[in-house]
């Protein structure tokens, strides 16, 4: 009885962790794995945007999120 309860708990917990991992893959891990593709997409999306026109006064100017230090 106790083994079945532990197995059920482990399966539920494992399923939850799998669902969280599946949700985070396209949000976080895919852009890290396909860096050039996302850099090109952002260049297209940001074409024609002047940072000074959209940046609120007093805030740091946004930069390339893929730029590494």
Curated annotation (Swiss-Prot):
Pfam families xrefs: DUF4538
Record GO biological process: mitochondrial cytochrome c oxidase assembly
UniProt keyword annotations, A-Z: Amidation, Membrane, Mitochondrion, Mitochondrion inner membrane, Secreted, Transit peptide, Transmembrane, Transmembrane helix
Protein's UniProt keywords contain Isomerase: no
Tissue expression profile of the protein: Highly expressed in the hypothalamus, substantia nigra reticulata, Edinger-Westphal nucleus, and nucleus of the solitary tract/dorsal motor nucleus of the vagus, the spinal cord, and sensory ganglia (at protein level). Also expressed in the heart, thymus, esophagus, stomach, spleen, lung, pituitary gland, kidney, jejunum, duodenum, ileum, cerebrum, pons, and colon (at protein level). Expressed in preadipocytes and apidocytes (at protein level). Expressed in pancreatic islet cells (at protein level).
Record GO cellular component, one term: extracellular region
Intervals, Mitochondrial intermembrane compartment: 30-69
Mitochondrial matrix side: 1-8
Phenylalanine amide modifications at: 66
Disulfide bonds: none
Transmembrane segments: 9-29
UniProt keyword annotation of Membrane present: yes
Oligomeric form and interacting partners: Component of the MITRAC (mitochondrial translation regulation assembly intermediate of cytochrome c oxidase complex) complex, the core components of this complex being Coa3/Mitrac12 and Cox14. Interacts with Coa3/Mitrac12 and Cox4i1. Directly interacts with newly synthesized Mt-Co1/Cox1.
Stored PANTHER family: SMALL INTEGRAL MEMBRANE PROTEIN 20
Protein name as it appears in the record: Small integral membrane protein 20
Organism lineage: Eukaryota, Metazoa, Chordata, Craniata, Vertebrata
């Amino acid at each position: 009885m106790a083994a079945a309860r532990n197995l059920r708990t482990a399966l539920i917990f494992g399923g939850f962790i799998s669902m969280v991992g599946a949700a985070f893959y396209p949000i976080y891990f895919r852009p890290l794995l396909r860096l050039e593709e996302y850099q090109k997409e952002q260049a297209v999306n940001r074409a024609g945007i002047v940072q000074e026109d959209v940046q609120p006064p007093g805030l740091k100017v946004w930069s390339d999120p893929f730029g590494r230090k």
